Amino acid sequence: MMPFDIRVGQGYDVHALVPGRKLILGGVEIPHDRGLLGHSDADALLHAVTDALFGAAALGDIGRHFPDTDAQFAGADSRALLREAARRVREAGYEIGNVDATVIAQAPKLAPHIGAMVANLAEDLAIARGRCNVKAKTNEKLGFEGRQEGIVAQAAVLLWRASVADAQD
């Protein structure tokens, strides 16, 4: 029997880029001529991290907890949803080890905003900045990301619990 219950979760989200919406990634408003379409603020990065948290803790997915059919989540701040997801994961007995995320977007350039995204993740998850990582990639002008039709985010998280005896069956 392992002395620790270690869990890894993977999250994914994609949203279309459309005119008339703000572009918000990692809780940062990024200047761009289009934004992401969605029921909430459509922050694909935070949605991927939220999904990874729920998955690692075997708590389902973001749609189960914050359904896009529920009017209370219309226009929701994804940072608030992420904080609530972290609370539920901790309530289930887990601590957040680290987060590694990738945003795939041909444009705009995200590198100038990575530091603010990492700071928001660390604050919302109540973990050190050194345990959060965000990478920005292009899709080399291939696929819908390369044509600037949408943005994809992927995330991996590690959770741990000090005793497997506490694990839910």
Curated annotation (Swiss-Prot):
Protein's organism: Cupriavidus taiwanensis (strain DSM 17343 / BCRC 17206 / CCUG 44338 / CIP 107171 / LMG 19424 / R1) (Ralstonia taiwanensis (strain LMG 19424))
SUPFAM superfamilies: IpsF-like
Biochemical pathway: Isoprenoid biosynthesis; isopentenyl diphosphate biosynthesis via DXP pathway; isopentenyl diphosphate from 1-deoxy-D-xylulose 5-phosphate: step 4/6
Single Gene Ontology MF annotation: metal ion binding
Keyword Lyase: yes
Keyword Transcription included in the entry's annotation: no
InterPro entries per UniProt: MECDP_synthase, MECDP_synthase_CS, MECDP_synthase_sf
Name of protein: 2-C-methyl-D-erythritol 2,4-cyclodiphosphate synthase
Top-level class of the enzyme under EC nomenclature: lyase
Record-listed a divalent metal cation binding positions: D13, H15, H47
Site-annotated residues for Transition state stabilizer: H39, T138
Assembly, per entry: Homotrimer.
PANTHER family: 2-C-METHYL-D-ERYTHRITOL 2,4-CYCLODIPHOSPHATE SYNTHASE, CHLOROPLASTIC
Reaction(s) catalysed by this chain's protein: 4-CDP-2-C-methyl-D-erythritol 2-phosphate = 2-C-methyl-D-erythritol 2,4-cyclic diphosphate + CMP
Gene: ispF
Cofactor binding summary note: Binds 1 divalent metal cation per subunit.
